[in-house]
């Protein structure tokens, strides 16, 4: 869909309305700033967040070169082959690649779980416009497009958005727009979105309070937000990015040195900071006072059995024990509604 047909978009610099003047350029009517457009994907990042290294440019050029003759899976593999994994242990390289390849199927399971749990707590005002923050290669976009009139995918990385663009083309999605942007400063008018969702994303955005404030700004009255958040104090499974147990129990300033000592990898490379139950609770309460919940997610959405889901349902209904269990459970499901 053309950018000019999405009137909720605003300039990240001044907040003015955006117009599409040329096929490869988007301009602000108010301040005159121009924003480049690649394959119909506008770059609406604030200037201070634009850092283009040689490696990033190289990956994008490779994907654009093979784009016309490639399918979604081929682009995923090409994208992964261009990443600098020289300092990453081999077992993690294999894990990252498999994670990417199966991300769309997992994204559909997450999307359905999010909406099912949300509808049991807070009714959506309508099913008009949904936005996925950190959409990456398009994990949840297909499923969202079946529920909402229009879907917007946001990610700061152009290379992954190019891969997502191919997925949308393969499934002939007409009700979707991809935008290179950041969650901390969304290029949307206030009170414009019905639903915001984020899969495996919160731990990669360190300014969680700012992120939640932006969600509250752009959601319309009654609009809702859902996200999963891996627990910093998970007792049961290894840290999801480096596969080491109990990393979150260390002081944050020690984590990088510990991970490097154990597996020879710089933890900052994964750009992750897992949230505890209390971290997540504080962020939700500040932006969505009294209209938020932290629930147990379905284990089946992560590849677990439905039998575990049944046990989790029992646990979640035990007074006192349910909240205590959330402190150490592997993952949290955050729900919120704007009043």
Feature map (PLM): residue ranges:
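A short SAM/SAH-binding and catalytic strip from SAM-dependent methyltransferases
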Residues: 194-206
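S-adenosyl-L-methionine-dependent methyltransferase catalytic module, highlighting the catalytic core
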Residues: 209-214, 224-335
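Class I S-adenosylmethionine-dependent transferase superfamily signal
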Residues: 144, 214-215
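Active-site micro-motifs of SAM-dependent methyltransferase domains
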Residues: 185, 203, 232-234
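Conserved N-terminal segment of class I S-adenosyl-L-methionine
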Residues: 2-189, 195, 329-333
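Helix-to-beta-strand junctions that scaffold the AdoMet/dcAdoMet cofactor pocket
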Residues: 205-206, 219-221
């Amino acid at each position: 869909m053309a950018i000019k047909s999405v009137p909720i978009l605003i300039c990240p610099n001044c907040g003015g309305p955006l117009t599409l003047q040329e096929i490869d350029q988007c301009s602000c009517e108010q301040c005159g700033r121009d924003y480049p457009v690649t394959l119909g994907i506008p770059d609406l990042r604030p200037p201070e967040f634009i850092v283009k290294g040689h490696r990033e440019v190289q990956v994008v050029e490779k994907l654009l070169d093979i784009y016309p003759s490639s399918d979604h899976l081929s682009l995923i593999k090409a994208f992964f082959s261009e990443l600098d994994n020289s300092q990453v242990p081999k077992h993690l390289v294999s894990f990252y690649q498999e994670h990417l390849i199966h991300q769309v199927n997992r994204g559909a399971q997450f999307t359905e779980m999010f909406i099912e749990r949300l509808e049991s707590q807070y009714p959506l005002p309508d099913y008009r416009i949904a936005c996925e923050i950190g959409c990456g290669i398009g994990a949840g976009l297909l499923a969202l497009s079946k529920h909402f009139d229009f879907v917007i995918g946001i990610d700061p990385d152009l290379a992954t958005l190019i891969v997502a663009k191919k997925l949308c083309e393969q499934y002939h999605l007409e009700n979707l727009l991809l935008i290179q942007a950041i969650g901390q400063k969304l290029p949307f008018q206030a009170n414009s979105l019905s639903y915001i969702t984020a899969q495996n994303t919160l731990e990669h955005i360190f300014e969680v309070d700012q992120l939640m404030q932006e969600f509250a700004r752009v959601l319309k009255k009654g609009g809702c937000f859902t996200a999963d958040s891996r627990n910093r104090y998970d007792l049961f499974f290894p840290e999801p990015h480096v596969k080491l147990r109990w990393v979150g129990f260390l002081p944050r300033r020690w984590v990088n040195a510990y991970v490097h000592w154990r597996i020879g990898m710089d933890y900052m490379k994964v750009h992750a900071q897992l949230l505890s139950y209390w971290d997540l609770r504080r962020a939700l309460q500040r932006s969505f006072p009294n209209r938020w919940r932290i629930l147990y997610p379905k284990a089946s959405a992560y590849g677990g059995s439905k039998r575990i889901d049944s046990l989790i349902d029992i646990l979640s209904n035990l007074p006192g024990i349910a909240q205590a269990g959330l402190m150490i459970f592997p993952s949290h499901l955050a729900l919120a509604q704007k009043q």
